[in-house]
């Protein structure tokens, strides 16, 4: 998967997970996060029909009510996260003007490398699709 869970930003009750999970357990959490959606739909014996509708509802509410919520969105990047001319899922502030700002979260060197790898995988698929 091209998902890059940011374990360096993960906390529990305000405490960084790195303070109570060793590297092996952190890697386990990362891998489980990547497949969590598929695991849940398999356990429920259904498809992901609710989540997309709920996500659209949150987006519309943030625009209509100018809530300026930070919401993960697939957006065309122009230098953010070191990427340009590619749509990737990143956090953005959504308000009455739509995308008000792409939130450029500081990444560790390892996370930057994984993000670049994911971006290159998307570029490869886009190339296969002739985008």
Description of each model-found segment:
Residues 1-131:
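C-terminal substrate-binding/catalytic lobe of Rossmann-fold NAD(P)-dependent dehydrogenases
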């Amino acid at each position: 998967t091209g998902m890059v869970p940011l374990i360096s930003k993960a906390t529990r009750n305000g405490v960084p997970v790195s303070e109570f999970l060793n590297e092996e357990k952190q890697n386990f959490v990362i891998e489980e996060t990547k497949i969590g959606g598929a695991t849940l739909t398999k356990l429920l014996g259904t498809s992901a029909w609710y989540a997309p509708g709920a996500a659209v509802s949150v987006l519309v509410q943030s625009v209509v009510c100018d809530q300026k919520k930070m919401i993960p969105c697939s957006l065309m990047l122009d230098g953010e996260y070191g990427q340009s001319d590619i749509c990737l899922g990143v956090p953005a502030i959504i308000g009455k003007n739509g995308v008000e700002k792409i939130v450029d979260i500081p990444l560790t060197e390892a996370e930057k490398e994984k993000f670049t790898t994911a971006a290159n995988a998307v570029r490869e698929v886009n190339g296969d699709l002739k985008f």
